[in-house]
Amino acid sequence: PDGSMKASSRVAPVAGETLERIDALLSRLGNPVGVSAYKPYHSSGEDFLHSFLGMIGIPIELTPQFREDAPVVFLNESARFDPTIVARIDKQLRAGKSIVITTGLLKALQGKGIEQIVDLEVSDRRVLTRSFSNLWGGVWEADRDILLPQVRYATNDSWEEITALAAEN
């Protein structure tokens, strides 16, 4: 009757007030930095992996452009849709920068030139485990079993940072 609007939801005004308070702090946070993650347009493979990494606290900057200026680029299986991805990986590494790839991408690039860059191969074997070690400082246990692909490599040419332990090894 007095012409004033009544909030139709108690959630929206509270959220608005909270966001206004946060706005006052944003200028003091600095420049957030995340790991550049390249996902070409219209690509798929290992879907939602970037989101899962973000949920465990790894800041991901997902982009459809391959960031040559990034010190580290994360690539999952979706990068296979870029026909120049092996050349991009090679160029990035030769520039002294780091590339992190998943076993999904490694398997997708087998026979397409990746073997000229790294002497690793994803086999068809899997291991179901919950035990892990860094080989130098103990064993850690996950809450549940995790199914992992086996990656073959020549010992002393490559070393894993973390190894999965099973009864067979």
Go through each PLM region and give its residues.
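Hydrophobic targeting/anchoring helices
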Residues: 1-59, 163
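Short secondary-structure capping/turn micro-motifs that flank functional sites
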Residues: 4, 68-70, 108-109
